[in-house]
Amino acid sequence: MVSRVFYGLLLALGIAAPAHAHHSFSAEFEADKTADLSGKIVQVWWNNPHIRYRLQVVGEGGTTEDWELQAASITAMQQLGWTQATIKVGDELTVSGQVGRNGAKKLYVRSIARPDGSRLMTGRGDATGPDPNQVHATPGKSYAYGATRNDYPVDISGPWRNRYKWRVTVDDLEPKPTPLSAEGRALFAATDHYQDPALRCLALGLPRLFGAPYNMEIVDAGTHYLIVYVEHNTPRRVWMDGRKPPPDTPPSSLGFSVGHWEGNALVIETTNLLPGWLDGSGLPMKGEGTRIVERYELAADHLSMDRIMTIYDPYYTQPLVRRRGSARDDSGVDIGEQAPCDPDSYYRDLLELGKLEQHLKGE
């Protein structure tokens, strides 16, 4: 690779957000503008909420510029076969991707070319291996751990792959346009991208956790289902014995969930939620008075399910709906512990934007 670098912004009409784009992709990057950069990797940050690299670019006059390259989370990239050694300090690369908003020297990586001609891809559609939107499972096979504890119509326990029918959790709620109330609209307008709790590695919680592409495991614990999400190693209990939340139950990011079966559908209702964001764009959730209803509708062969979430929140004049899917998988579903989230990149961004002092003062 030549050390002299040419980079140019290209209008790329019709390019969608990357399949593994992190929570705030739309707020940080221009989905319809791309750049091609060539240079040398001078720094690697292998941590969550997203992997980052620093690329040193040499211009026509010999001057250098540093660009920050961003990819998805460690878990998402590992699902595509990446490791910490995939890109190392000293590697010379040509990188293509979406550029940062407002002139920021950032690039969300779509593809990488090495000097030997080999390429690395970061998007689902570019990855090798089975199509994640197809079910790769065997009819009649048991995916549960041991005997079923309860006489439910369906045994939903075991591991599930959540990249099935997945989409980025930004601007994915229906209906459109978003039916914000006057209070909700004012709050949304005053929201800054850098207030995103996910960037600070805070618990994602509901309803955003529902939309994540990472795998989950469901365990029948008798009185309740225990749902373990790979995302931030998060456990969630869904009570199936009809209990109500105790009067002194504090609100939390996952709230208090109760469930029941309606035929082949597990129905979960959640209350007692903390205020938060509904998606990566910053749509607000009030928490107090918020009610979330989920339906996990199993297919006839029980190898996949459609998950539908309906959100009732005082900041909106109509219920909001989010749709995802889950599938069994014969090749195995990784439910191992996720690498811990590191907020270092969040504070670095605040420092570069001159907002760190403002943040520390709570302004």
Regions found by a protein language model. Give the residues of each.
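Bacterial N-terminal signal peptides
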Residues: 6-17
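Signal peptide processing junction and immediate N-terminal pro/mature segment
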Residues: 19-21
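PEST-like low-complexity, intrinsically disordered acidic/proline/serine-rich tracts
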Residues: 23-363
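Positively charged n-region of N-terminal signal peptides that target proteins for export
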Residues: 1-4
